[in-house]
């Protein structure tokens, strides 16, 4: 299956030099381009991903306390040095959108605010997916 071939190509390209790579997201704040991958500063609404479990062990402590949805914890990990990438593989997957999100969202009164690490970034800075 081509999806698995594409994911394997990321493993072949990065080896052990990454913590996470996402293949689907609704929005992201790009950083730099590295080979076929886009390094990100912030990413949200991820559905398909590759995690280097051994490299992620050093970041486990930053998941606690779980004071935010796990998608929003990624920016904290990136701020601590985690190498997080995105590669658009949506042409190889089908996302079931027949149900509403089960994720609780908190009304904070700041419509353009989305990141603790980048509080001055606005939705205009975000690269949107699908």
Give residue ranges: language-model regions.
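An acidic/histidine-cluster motif and surrounding catalytic segment
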Residues: 2-130
């Amino acid at each position: 299956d081509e999806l698995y071939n594409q994911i394997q190509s990321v493993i072949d390209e990065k080896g052990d030099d990454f913590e996470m790579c996402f293949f689907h997201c609704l929005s992201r704040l790009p950083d730099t381009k590295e080979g076929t991958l886009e390094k990100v500063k912030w990413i949200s609404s991820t559905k398909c991903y590759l995690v280097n479990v051994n490299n992620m062990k050093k970041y486990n402590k930053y998941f606690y306390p779980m004071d935010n949805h796990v998608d929003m914890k990624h920016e904290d990990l990136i701020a601590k040095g985690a190498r997080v990438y995105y590669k658009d593989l949506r042409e190889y997957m089908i996302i079931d959108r027949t149900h509403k999100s089960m994720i609780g969202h908190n009304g904070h009164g700041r419509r353009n605010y989305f990141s603790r690490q980048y509080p001055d970034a606005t939705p205009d800075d975000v690269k949107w997916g699908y």
